């Protein structure tokens, strides 16, 4: 499970930002808090803020970190590729524009009976990796122990947490643009592979991006084509928000000679109102919301099975607030979410900003100042003008919209359409 994500000098975040999913001592919804080792962890983080405040950059930062962990060994001997994949720093001051960016996570691994906590991170600049570290902490330990540490010079390389044979292989193959974690995973070093696999298991969906919507809508659930039981599960999934779809009919489309991949035509079956027959409607003709929920199913299925993290940008796009709430309740119900999956999402849907749904430490805000610098903060840490913290019985939605918590747009009348 993700405990904490820290990043610095990435896009609009010049200074270090911390997204913390560790549970505070607040008492509301205590039954949803998951205990792993010595950590108490939350299943959800909801991120609010004005348009262009930098909310999506939190999503982008974790996606960047995950992508680099997965594939950094591809850039070791190709500087042009590395240049394309370098993180974008804060560009509005010359110092930050040329400085390194940093990314760090604290997390636990699913199925780890020892219930260790891991701390992994790296710093990267225009030349390559300047620092990288992996630490681990046993369930009963107070301090982290070093698995490896890497600095800028050769004498700042500590691989003491690896077997001797693995150390030699890594030292020989390591290049400046390559992370030890992704190189070690490629070399089948167990600890490195486990960490890389944790990143790979997490899912990302940007519903503000039409390309994401296009490609996700074409991803079919695992076993959907050949397994009628899987199709029935998808029907039951749809029944939680739309009972009109009773079944699916799947037809393989003949190859056109240009592609080797199998493609399918999917029709949704609806019950006729004047008979017991079924009307077939191409899935692509269903509503945008229905298509989005169909696209979400494979990712949701995998996240719940693996106990991984689902990052979603603009979750509310084209979905009714009640449907969004029902989707979130999937993660908040321990009977459904038995593998402790988590969801981190950005949204403008203030109806979910409720003390009937979320804890104060599950609600986050992003605000951008006049210099273009974004700041991330939690409702649990927010202090009002009187110096008081937010009570759990407050109307979060109302207070947010009147500006009590900040992170709302500053609006002016649109006068340009006035007639002279």
Q: Model-found features: residue ranges?
A:
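C-terminal lobe/lid and adjacent interdomain/linker elements of RecA-like ASCE P-loop ATPase modules
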Residues: 4, 326-420
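Extended helical coiled-coil dimerization/tether regions that scaffold
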Residues: 8, 212-285, 396, 404-405, ...
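Electropositive, glycine-dotted interaction segments
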Residues: 115-253
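Pre-Walker A-like glycine/lysine-rich segment at the N-terminus of P-loop NTPase domains
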Residues: 2-64
């Amino acid at each position: 499970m993700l405990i904490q994500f820290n990043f610095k000098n990435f896009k609009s975040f010049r200074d270090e930002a911390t997204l913390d999913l560790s549970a505070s001592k607040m008492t509301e919804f205590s039954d949803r808090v998951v205990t792993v080792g010595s950590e108490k962890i939350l299943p959800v983080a909801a991120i609010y803020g004005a348009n262009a405040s930098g909310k999506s950059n939190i999503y982008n930062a974790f996606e960047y970190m995950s992508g680099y962990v997965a594939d950094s060994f591809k850039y070791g001997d190709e500087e042009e590729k590395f240049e394309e994949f370098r993180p974008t720093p804060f560009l509005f001051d010359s110092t930050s524009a040329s400085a390194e960016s940093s990314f760090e996570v604290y997390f636990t691994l699913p199925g780890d009976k020892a219930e260790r906590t891991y701390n992994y991170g790296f710093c990267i600049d225009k030349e390559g990796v300047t620092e990288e570290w992996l630490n681990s902490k046993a369930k009963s330990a107070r301090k982290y122990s070093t698995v490896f540490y890497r600095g800028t010079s050769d004498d700042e390389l500590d691989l003491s947490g690896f077997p001797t044979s693995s150390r030699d292989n890594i030292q020989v193959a390591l290049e400046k643009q390559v992370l030890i974690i992704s190189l070690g995973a490629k070399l089948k070093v167990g600890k490195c592979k486990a960490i890389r696999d944790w990143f790979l298991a997490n899912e990302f969906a940007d519903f503000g991006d039409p390309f994401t919507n296009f490609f996700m809508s074409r991803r079919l659930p695992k076993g959907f084509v050949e397994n009628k039981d899987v199709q029935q599960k998808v029907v039951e999934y749809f029944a939680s928000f739309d009972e009109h779809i009773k079944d699916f009919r799947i037809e393989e489309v003949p190859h056109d000679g240009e592609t080797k991949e199998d493609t399918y035509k999917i029709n949704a079956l609806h019950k006729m109102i004047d008979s017991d027959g079924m009307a077939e409607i191409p899935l692509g003709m269903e509503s945008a919301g229905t298509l989005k929920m169909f696209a979400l199913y494979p990712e949701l299925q995998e996240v719940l099975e693996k106990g991984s993290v689902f990052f979603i940008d603009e979750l509310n796009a084209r979905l009714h607030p009640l449907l969004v709430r029902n989707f979130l309740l999937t993660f908040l119900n321990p009977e459904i979410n038995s593998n402790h999956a988590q969801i981190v999402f950005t949204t403008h849907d203030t109806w979910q900003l409720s003390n009937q749904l979320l804890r104060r430490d599950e609600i986050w805000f992003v605000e951008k100042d006049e210099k273009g610098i974004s700041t991330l903060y939690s409702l649990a840490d927010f202090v009002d003008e009187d110096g008081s913290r937010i009570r759990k019985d407050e109307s979060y939605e109302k207070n947010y919209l009147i500006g009590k918590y900040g992170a709302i747009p500053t609006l002016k009348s649109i006068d340009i359409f006035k007639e002279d």
